[in-house]
Amino acid sequence: MRAVISALLITVVIASAATVTAPASAAPQAAAPQACPAYLDHEFRKLHSSQTINICKAFAGKPLLIVNTASHCGFTPQFKGLEATYQKYKGRGLVVVGFASDDFNQEAKDEAEAADTCFLNYGVTFTMLSPQHVKGPEANPVFQELNRQTAAPGWNFNKYLVRADGKVLQHLDSKVAPESSEFTTAVESLLK
């Protein structure tokens, strides 16, 4: 008797599952993910690491704050404010990406030293990339496009606010500190 009841229960469960499951063609279509702009679809090596990151794959559809950085610059203390910005807004989707660069001859010649400046001295937890060019004909593909849409960095710690669709919203120069109301207003505008 128990065997018959068990068999009937199994049959009912299977039949119920078959009627509840809709055919794949009837399933609602999810919205297509936003296409990532080609200029962000590149592999970059992380600072003082062998690991690489593709900005599109890692951060597609998220607003970005992209900054060219250097570890021996008068603006280097901005790392602290950039980290505070990242901590404050990451819950709202903001991603901060620092591109170390020696284009203005102020980056440490040793990547370990540059990493210590960022990670140990300033407690940076946002993505930092290995030194590369951010201006001129040798600029990496990200900065080629940022420079095209706005302006090339005139110094270290230029900040580029990039919408989730890849369009550059605003370029802020080195003198605009992460703690300033101008900067905060720009970030808030990006996240609307």
Task: Outline where the language-model segments fall.
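Positively charged n-region of N-terminal signal peptides that target proteins for export
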Residues: 1-4
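Thiol-/selenol-based redox modules, centered on thioredoxin-like
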Residues: 141-144, 148-192
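Loop/turn elements at helix/coil->beta-strand transitions in domains of secreted/extracellular proteins
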Residues: 60-64, 90-95, 122-127, 156-157, ...
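Amphipathic alpha-helical repeat scaffolds
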Residues: 68-72
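A short beta-strand-turn-helix
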Residues: 42-63, 84-89
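Structural microenvironment flanking redox-active thiols in thiol-disulfide oxidoreductases
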Residues: 75-139
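N-proximal helix/coil linker or "cap" segments that precede and/or mark the start of modular domains
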Residues: 20-43
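Bacterial N-terminal signal peptides
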Residues: 7-17
